[in-house]
């Protein structure tokens, strides 16, 4: 195959520079509004501050370096505060964010999207499982593993509670600005009397078809619209059509049925 022309390479370089510039602006805006994201502390701990500073000095924190776009085998180090598996790339200069992967597991993943110091990745194959945490028999939702609404269904409940306790402990450690001796002990997470059907808040999403988005402000068709209403698939970024959530309370699920029908 012939190499891209000089003009094509120049256009691609300008496009990538614009992408990085826009990402940097968006990140700065996010930090001003919400403060440092929790994953920043995982980045500093796992890459090491000297490596992070080196990448920042080269202005390369958003670059799509290898193994972006290539399958790679890694070992999951920990879970993020959002419940996603985290692993270092073989090069040691990026974090892979892997939904539904567990600490200690060896997984083949595909990094498909990039952010600041991280590549969002999907599991291709689990090569070595964490047998003490991954209990597939606990899963009660047919969408689990695709839907991004929850991450812990395959984990025994007692371990879920400890994971949530650790999230709170790390939040105090990183955001309180207190000396470690002044940070209060985080007590064990109080269990819910219900293992399922306990969540009292759900936030379903929907995407209008492109034809309706283009017709914004015009007359809306009277016939029902085939639109997915549910929760995001983290691997595709698309909304999955989900009629019921087994974690939500019965009252919420009844309300969701009505609202789904009303939107359609």
Ranges and model annotations:
Residues 2-264:
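Accessory RNA-recognition modules of RNA-modification enzymes
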């Amino acid at each position: 195959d012939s190499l891209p022309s000089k003009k094509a390479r120049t256009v691609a370089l300008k496009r990538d520079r614009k992408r990085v510039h826009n990402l940097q602006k968006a990140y700065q805006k996010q930090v001003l509004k919400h403060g440092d994201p929790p994953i920043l502390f995982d980045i500093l701990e796992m890459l090491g501050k000297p490596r992070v500073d080196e990448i920042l000095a080269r202005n390369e924190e958003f670059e799509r370096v290898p193994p972006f776009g290539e399958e790679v085998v890694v070992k999951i180090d920990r879970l993020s505060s959002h419940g996603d598996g985290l692993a270092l790339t073989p090069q040691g200069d990026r974090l892979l964010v892997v939904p539904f992967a567990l600490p200690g597991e060896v997984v083949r993943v595909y990094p498909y999207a990039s952010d600041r110091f991280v590549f969002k990745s999907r599991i291709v194959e689990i090569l070595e499982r964490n047998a003490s945490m991954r209990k597939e028999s606990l899963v009660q939702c047919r969408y689990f593993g695709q839907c991004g609404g929850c991450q812990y269904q395959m984990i025994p409940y007692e371990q879920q509670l400890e994971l949530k306790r650790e999230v709170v402990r790390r939040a105090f450690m990183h955001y309180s600005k207190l000396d470690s001796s002044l940070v209060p002990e985080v007590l064990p997470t109080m269990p819910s009397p219900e293992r399922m059907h306990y969540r009292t808040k759900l936030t379903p999403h929907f995407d209008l078809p492109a034809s309706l988005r283009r017709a914004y402000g015009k007359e809306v068709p009277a016939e029902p619209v085939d639109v997915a209403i549910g929760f995001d698939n983290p691997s595709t970024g698309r909304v999955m059509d989900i009629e019921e959530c087994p974690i939500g309370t019965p009252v919420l699920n009844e309300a969701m049925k009505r609202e789904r029908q009303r939107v359609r």
